[in-house]
Amino acid sequence: MDEAVGDLKQALPCVAEAPTVHVEVHQRSGSTAKKEDVKLNVRKLLNRHNIVFGDYTWTEFDEPFLTRNVQSVSIVDTELKVKDPQPIDLSTCTVALHVFQLNEGGPSSENLEEETENIIAANHWLLPAAEFHGLWDSLVYDAEVKSHLLDYVMTTLLFSDKNVDSNLITWNRVVLLHGPPGTGKTSLCKALAQKLTIRLSSRYRYGQLIEINSHSLFSKWFSESGKLVTRMFQMIQDLIDDKDALVFVLIDEVESLTAARNACRAGTEPSDAIRVVNAVLTQIDQIKRHSNVVILTTSNITERIDVAFVDRADIRQYVGPPSAAAIFKIYLSCLEELMKCQIIYPRQQLLTLRELEMIGFIENNVSKLSLLLSEISRKSEGLSGRVLRKLPFLAHALYIQAPTVTIEGFLQALSLAVDRQFEDRKKLSCV
């Protein structure tokens, strides 16, 4: 991370208290049971399982009430702040239950009318959304990015609750994720919005996610773009006025909205671009007064973002390509899914990277396949998370082409797919 990016850890408080264990309870869509009744029965379940080892999910229950009303009970995010899974004694922890039901409907469009055109200015989700279920867990990062982002938003709510004078201590509720394309910045923003809606379900009845289509807000008559930005944020203000809702505003590729003033002065951008920058900054200053809004932004080209916008971001987090250790976790989750679906058959146990470390990476019948996966992970360094998630599909399509395959055969195909990916890159760079 470059020097211009503040240390995320320094921006967040360290609280020395009894650990809190978060338990997410996915209530069935058709269930009409009261949340308090669901929580009561889940606590009975947890009382029978005082000791758990890291994250854990129940999907089958002995209790008929849970079978009828609950899809799953998950102990989550225990590994965000510790490197290795640890036994957890629930009787010594504060257990926070978060009961939620997923909204099955997809996104709706927010339109702005401009003369004869109807501009799709944003996509709008009601959270928690079925579309984003499981997205948080699928994102793998080396640093404590996910836990720090969660802590940041919780801190903004704490400061608002305690009526901290924002003239003395400022926070703008703006997060900027920047880094190369394909590293999962936009997905992380959506997953964070979903996670926080669930985490804060006792405080807010639902969440709203507005993904602004930055490019569509640039009118073909450039001078009108500032007005479009203002109208877009007025629509968002209507959502913020509902205090039962936690509102997330996602601006993807924010550099397209905040074209640097320097470029305007140099004559490489139209002078009307300054009006767009000013409109965005003014609207952010307007909505930051509200405690139920968080602005999430991403950028692939940090250098093009207006300095005044960067200064408004409380957290500027670099999101880079995954390391070999993170790649191993990504591949492992892909293999588990393919074994669950019986595309890889028969199922075989794979060791985690931590378990390989504990045996000193010694090769034997138990560790052989996991060591091969570790080797494939190392040679995959440099590939983005987006590409890595696609490689198992490409491996099957290009080198297997059969309904089922052994894990040995699949790992060989995956290795070939990685080699081909780098070869294709080399050819493209030569064009």
Curated annotation (Swiss-Prot):
InterPro entries: AAA+_ATPase (IPR003593), ATPase_AAA_core (IPR003959), ATPase_AAA_CS (IPR003960), ClpA/B (IPR001270), P-loop_NTPase (IPR027417), Pch2-like (IPR044539). Signal peptide: none annotated. It comes from Sus scrofa. The modification N-acetylmethionine is found at M1. ATP binds at G179, P180, P181, G182, T183, G184, K185, T186. The keyword Oxidoreductase does not apply. One of its GO terms (biological process) is oogenesis. Belongs to the AAA ATPase family. PCH2 subfamily. The keyword ATP-binding applies. This is Pachytene checkpoint protein 2 homolog. It comes from the Eukaryota. The gene is TRIP13. Keywords: Acetylation, ATP-binding, Differentiation, Meiosis, Nucleotide-binding, Oogenesis, Spermatogenesis. It holds the Pfam family AAA. GO terms for molecular function: ATP binding; ATP hydrolysis activity. Plays a key role in chromosome recombination and chromosome structure development during meiosis. Required at early steps in meiotic recombination that leads to non-crossovers pathways. Also needed for efficient completion of homologous synapsis by influencing crossover distribution along the chromosomes affecting both crossovers and non-crossovers pathways. Also required for development of higher-order chromosome structures and is needed for synaptonemal-complex formation. In males, required for efficient synapsis of the sex chromosomes and for sex body formation. One of its GO terms (cellular component) is chromosome. Specifically interacts with the ligand binding domain of the thyroid receptor (TR). This interaction does not require the presence of thyroid hormone for its interaction. Interacts with proteasome subunit PSMA8; to participate in meiosis progression during spermatogenesis.
